Each structure stands twice: as structure tokens, then as C-alpha cells.
């Protein structure tokens, strides 16, 4: 993502940014100088774009950065939509950036009267550094090893975000767009808590992973019953943060020089749903264990179902891929219907899932509240913890305290004891 949250940090990065800024301003050929405030905004945007493009050169996954070009996606940010559009336009003219515009894609297979959508929802605009930009950056001396010496990650200023409900065009899910909201006492309370979390973690040293600061994102803000009680996860900003890493890679991180462990909540949403419906949990064992099926298949079915309003008639492609990557060969007996029958024999209340008035956003909210409650308890003990949605990463020596705070959070809020597993480098302990 082109997050626009990095700034110059050294003489080297300053000269690189200033040289490019001078060059694109010469291309612009303005008749008159910008007003002071407009020039400050322009300079800031150039700096942020160059910082992101330089970082993308050393991204092993993809050189492409994405950025929504909706004007409302810039609301509340230090850099405005018009300024951003101007800067990337000038950089494209200078052949420093390659832009792949987003937007809807025409459905070439649509036939008259077939009911299919005329367009598929498109991707956000993609951008990458051009070969010219790459040559200039490498010639200047930037590398993956020294990037953080020359560019500074700033703390996020927008700590609470709200999105409308997502929608679908046939089988294609359309990502939820940002939604504006008026600040209230409740949103200020949420904002201050996120700020407290960020301030504490920015004082810690996370090695082997990148912490960029959290934003708490709430969902389905356009629902009538929304009251800051849907979604609400802590998301680390940017596309190279520790939350985006594979679990094995995260276990190689260190917190303040100490080895880490990841404490996972076993079947978190399923546990929460049991509590909200006052349904008794099985006395022991892995909640994803159903006789005759690999764990990944049962987890996949439950995850797919609780994230949808109805029962799926076939496996979502992403879930099928996840199962096959776990080494499981999909067979005819693993249809959504047959696996569902097996799951519902263990959890009968799931047979009425489409009629239950609890949706994924409520389950996510309850989980997020338990996670933030546990983080607060650990923080008061001086212990740094880094969430990955349904798990907490802590120093190995604090595993016991992390487990105790998570168990207490679920018990206090939901009246249910969650089951935990601990993953360490070279070791794992199941619930």
C-alpha cells in the first residue's frame, strides 16, 4: 500500500527528495508560485510518495503499491486527494512512476438477459517505481539494509476508521469503502486507547518485524444498529508490517531483544458464538476436531460459514487454496454440504446459522475487545504484546501471563474460558 506515512531522515534522503521535487516542478511550468500552505502540502506529498516508492524497491513480494483514488479515502489525512493526484501525475510525466489505473472491469462474458453484472468491481490504482526511479535510488546508495536509516516511519494520526458494509456482485466481494463519522465521547475513548497502545509499543524494540502503529477499523457503519460494536480490530498500517508476515517468520522476531511466542485463541469466533448463544462448549480438546476430517477442512468450513450470512454451496476459492496448502487433497466427500453435516453433528446450533441474528462483525468486535482488554492488562504490567487478530505475540518469558490475561478477558466479558495454544520457534503446544 502507498501509505504516505514515511518521511526523510537523513541528508541522503533529503537530497534525493529535493532533486526529484525540483525536476518535476520544472516540468510543471507554473505561471505563478504556489501559496505557502499549498507549497507545504505539495512538498510533503512529494516526500511521502518518494519514501514509499523507494521502500517498494526492496519489497520481495511485489513492487506494486496500491492506493484508492476515491477522494474520500484522503479525508482526514495530512495529504489531500488533489495534491496527491497532481504529484503522481507529474512523476508519471517525468517517467519516475508507472501507474495502473483502478476502476471497474467490463464483464466480457456477459450475455443479454443472463442476469450477470456488466462490470466486475475493479482494483484500487496500482503504482510502482519506474526503471528510471530505481536506477536513481540505487545510484544514490539506498538498499534494503539501510532504508530505515534514511526514512522515518511517522506515528499514525488517524487512529479510528469506519467503513460501510461490503457488497457483492455475484460471487465477487466488493471491499467496503471508508465512511465519515462525527466524533463523539465514545469515539474519543476509542481513539485515546489506540493512542495509548501505540505510544507504549513505539517505546519498545521489535526486531525482525515492522511495527508502524495501529488503527482501529470498525465495519458496517451504515447499519441501523451500529453503535461502534461491529468489527473494531487493531490493524497495523502499511503493507510490510509484522501482521502481514507468515507465522513462522513472526516467530523469529524479538521483543526488546527477547525471543517471542505467539499465543493463539483456538476457534475464537466459534467460542464467542457459543457464549453469545449460551450454548455449552465441549469439555476439552480442539474445537476444530471432527472425526474423519483433517483439522484444516473443519476450520475452513467454520471460518467460511461464520464470515457469510448463508451456507456456502461450494468452497470459496481462497478457502480451498488454504486447505490444499495445508497438504490436504480435496475429495468428493469434502463437499461443503458433507463437511457441514459433520460439523453440525458436533455443533447442532449451527444448523440455524442463517436465522441467527449474530454476524461476523459482532464476532470480530467481541474478539477485538477481548484482545485489547488483555493487551491493557499486560501493558499495566510493563509487558509488550503485539496482536495478530486472534493471537498475541509476547516474549517467551511472559507466556504464562499472556495466557492468564486472555483467559480472564474472555471469561470476564463473555463468561467463557477460551482455549489457547502456544507457538514458539521450533515448538508448538496445542489446546
Which residue stretches match the model-derived regions?
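Catalytic palm active-site di-aspartate
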Residues: 264, 302, 384-395
Amino acid at each position: 500500500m502507498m501509505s504516505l506515512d514515511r518521511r526523510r531522515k537523513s541528508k541522503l534522503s533529503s537530497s534525493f527528495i529535493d532533486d526529484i521535487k525540483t525536476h518535476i516542478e520544472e516540468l510543471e511550468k507554473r505561471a505563478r508560485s504556489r501559496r505557502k500552505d499549498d507549497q507545504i502540502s505539495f512538498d510533503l506529498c512529494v516526500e511521502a510518495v518518494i519514501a514509499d516508492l523507494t521502500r517498494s524497491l526492496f519489497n520481495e513480494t511485489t513492487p506494486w503499491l496500491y492506493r484508492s483514488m476515491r477522494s474520500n479515502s484522503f479525508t482526514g489525512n495530512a495529504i489531500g486527494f488533489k495534491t496527491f493526484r497532481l504529484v503522481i501525475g507529474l512523476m508519471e510525466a517525468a517517467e519516475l512512476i508507472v501507474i495502473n489505473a483502478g476502476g471497474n472491469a467490463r464483464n466480457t462474458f456477459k450475455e443479454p438477459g443472463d442476469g450477470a453484472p456488466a462490470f466486475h468491481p475493479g482494483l484500487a490504482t496500482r503504482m510502482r517505481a519506474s526503471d528510471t526511479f530505481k536506477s536513481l535510488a540505487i545510484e544514490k546508495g539506498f538498499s534494503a539494509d539501510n532504508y530505515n536509516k534514511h526514512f522515518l516511519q511517522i506515528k499514525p494520526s488517524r487512529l479510528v476508521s469506519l467503513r460501510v458494509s461490503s457488497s457483492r456482485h455475484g460471487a465477487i466481494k466488493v471491499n467496503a469503502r471508508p465512511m465519515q463519522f462525527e466524533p463523539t465521547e465514545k469515539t474519543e475513548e476509542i481513539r485515546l486507547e489506540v493512542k495509548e497502545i501505540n505510544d507504549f509499543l513505539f517505546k519498545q524494540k521489535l526486531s525482525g518485524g515492522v511495527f508502524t502503529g495501529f488503527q482501529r477499523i470498525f465495519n458496517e457503519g451504515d447499519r441501523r444498529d451500529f453503535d461502534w460494536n461491529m468489527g473494531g480490530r487493531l490493524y497495523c498500517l502499511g503493507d510490510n508490517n509484522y501482521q502481514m508476515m507468515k507465522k513462522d517468520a513472526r516467530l523469529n522476531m524479538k521483543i526488546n531483544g527477547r525471543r517471542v511466542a505467539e499465543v493463539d485463541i483456538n476457534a475464537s469466533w466459534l467460542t464467542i458464538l457459543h457464549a453469545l448463544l449460551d450454548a455449552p462448549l465441549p469439555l476439552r480438546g480442539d474445537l476444530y476436531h471432527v472425526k474423519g476430517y483433517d483439522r484444516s477442512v473443519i476450520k475452513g468450513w467454520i471460518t467460511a460459514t461464520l464470515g457469510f450470512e448463508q451456507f456456502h454451496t461450494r468452497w470459496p476459492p481462497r478457502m480451498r487454496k488454504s486447505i490444499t496448502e495445508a497438504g490436504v487433497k480435496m475429495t468428493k466427500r469434502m463437499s461443503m454440504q458433507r463437511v457441514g453435516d459433520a460439523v453440525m453433528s458436533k455443533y447442532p446450533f449451527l444448523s440455524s446459522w442463517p436465522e441467527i441474528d449474530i454476524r461476523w462483525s459482532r464476532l470480530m468486535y467481541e474478539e477485538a475487545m477481548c484482545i485489547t482488554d488483555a493487551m491493557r492488562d499486560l501493558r499495566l504490567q510493563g509487558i509488550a504484546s503485539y496482536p495478530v487478530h486472534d493471537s498475541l505475540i509476547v516474549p517467551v518469558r511472559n507466556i504464562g501471563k499472556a495466557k492468564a490475561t486472555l483467559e480472564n478477558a474472555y471469561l470476564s466479558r463473555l463468561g467463557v474460558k477460551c482455549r489457547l495454544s502456544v507457538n514458539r520457534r521450533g515448538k508448538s503446544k496445542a489446546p
